[in-house]
């Protein structure tokens, strides 16, 4: 009978890089729980597998053994399917999928629906989970990876999220720097009108202002403005930087933005 180690190493030959404790137990019904646990612990100690989630394992390809971890893109889809959770790769991590590589993310950002999940932290990786009330699946792309597929927010949703979660991504200036790289991928005219219902209107206002007044991406900015106009929302004034005093600050009438922050774009 094959050993657990050989069973594990055979899986990548079939294109599988993840497995669960239950799968091992089913494959080795005559083996005790203690023996299975010891066999898996040995493979973890050798760096051949890792466990980002209790009962869920990732097979580490040879080229990643010395690092002791693999990119989250290798296993995230399988892990979230195992948990029965909807998700998408978001914020700076999503922006990198769309070619915005100037701001290299130090953590892998994943958007989920409630209930919240604890961040997954290992010696070589950090996955940060953000919650929103509903995953707008129509605006999530299915991207192919080396080991399968992964869900990534479309460029437009990525752009809006960067401003919705500006406090989590560093600053408005950092978000604007990423938007400068994303701009050529943005076309809000291609989106259905219900997109406005899926995101905070204030984030669209901030995005439109930055595209229009800071990045001078007039055509893209107009596609945002047209989407807002078609939605029928009556825009209210909102601060450019959430949570910061806006007393006495300049007001932009078109976007209904209170300019309470000076934006500085990094050189690209």
Where are these regions (language model features)?
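A residue-level signal for conserved active-site and pocket-lining positions in enzyme catalytic cores
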Residues: 24, 94, 159
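Short amphipathic alpha-helical segments with coiled-coil-like heptad repeat character
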Residues: 32-33, 102-104, 167-171
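Short beta-edge/loop segments at beta->alpha junctions of small alpha/beta modules
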Residues: 2-86, 183-205, 211-212
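Hydrophobic alpha-helical interaction segments
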Residues: 140-268
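Hydrophobic/aromatic-lined pockets within catalytic cores
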Residues: 29, 84, 99, 164-167
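Short gly/ser-rich loop at a beta-strand->alpha-helix junction or flexible surface loop bordering the NTP-binding
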Residues: 51-63, 69-135
């Amino acid at each position: 009978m094959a050993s657990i180690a050989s069973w594990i190493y055979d899986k990548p030959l079939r294109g599988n890089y993840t497995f669960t404790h239950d799968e091992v137990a089913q494959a080795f019904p005559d083996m005790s729980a203690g023996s299975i646990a010891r066999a898996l612990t040995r493979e973890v100690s050798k760096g051949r597998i890792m466990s980002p989630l209790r009962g869920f394992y990732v097979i580490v390809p040879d080229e990643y053994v010395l690092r002791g971890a693999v990119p989250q893109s290798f296993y995230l889809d399988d892990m979230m399917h195992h948990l029965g959770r909807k998700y998408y790769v978001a914020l700076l991590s999503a922006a990198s999928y769309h070619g915005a590589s100037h701001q290299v993310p130090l953590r892998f950002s994943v958007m989920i629906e409630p209930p919240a999940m604890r961040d997954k932290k290992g010696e070589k990786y950090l996955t940060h989970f953000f919650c929103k009330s509903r995953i707008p699946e129509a605006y999530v792309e299915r991207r192919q990876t080396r080991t399968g597929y992964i869900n990534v927010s479309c460029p437009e949703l990525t752009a809006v999220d960067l401003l919705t979660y500006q406090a989590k991504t560093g600053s408005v200036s950092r978000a604007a720097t990423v938007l400068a790289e994303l701009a050529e991928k943005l076309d809000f005219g291609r989106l259905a009108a219900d997109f406005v219902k899926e995101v905070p209107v204030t984030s669209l206002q901030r995005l439109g202002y930055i595209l229009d007044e800071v990045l001078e991406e007039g055509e893209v900015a107009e596609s945002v403005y047209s989407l807002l106009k078609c939605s029928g929302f009556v825009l209210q004034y909102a601060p450019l930087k959430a949570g910061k005093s806006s007393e006495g600050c300049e007001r932009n009438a078109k976007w209904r933005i209170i300019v309470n922050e000076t934006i500085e774009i990094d050189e690209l």
